[in-house]
């Protein structure tokens, strides 16, 4: 359910602020998304929408939407992959995401990684993603994941 920042505690607000900073690391000229994973008030992993490790992020790849989508790893999945790369478990963690709601593909990864709560801050999502975000909400509910949308 969509809420307001006033409903969150001070730690949620702080972590969302950090996820917002992480989103600025993305080189995507049109969409910047940031995700962080937190466990026991400790930052475990970060991710932003970008290309996989070692893949050149040429301007022509970023500026052509059709081409870009073939390369980009979503922030949530990058957060999961980065945790794995650094031998960090996301089991029982909270993921904070700034920019867009969680798509159904990222929801699957979040569930499989053992995240127990997701806090997503975003403005209105594009209508074309309505079905994807609807499926995300259903999967999170069924998996027992708390999903706070702001």
Region locations from a protein language model:
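Zinc-dependent deaminase catalytic domain
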Residues: 1-150
């Amino acid at each position: 359910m969509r809420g307001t920042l006033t409903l969150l505690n001070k730690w949620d607000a702080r972590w969302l602020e950090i996820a917002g900073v992480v989103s600025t690391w993305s080189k995507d000229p049109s969409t910047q998304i940031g995700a962080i994973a937190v466990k026991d008030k400790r930052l475990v992993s970060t991710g932003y929408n970008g290309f996989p490790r070692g893949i050149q992020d040429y301007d022509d790849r970023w500026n052509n939407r059709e081409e870009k989508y073939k390369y980009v790893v979503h922030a949530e999945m990058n957060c999961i992959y980065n945790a794995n790369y650094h031998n960090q478990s996301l089991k029982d963690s909270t993921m904070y995401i700034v920019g867009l709601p969680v798509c159904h593909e990222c929801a699957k990864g979040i569930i499989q990684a053992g995240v127990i709560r997701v806090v997503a801050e975003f403005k209105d999502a594009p209508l074309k993603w309505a079905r994807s975000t609807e499926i995300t909400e259903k999967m999170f509910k069924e998996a027992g994941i708390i999903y706070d949308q702001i």
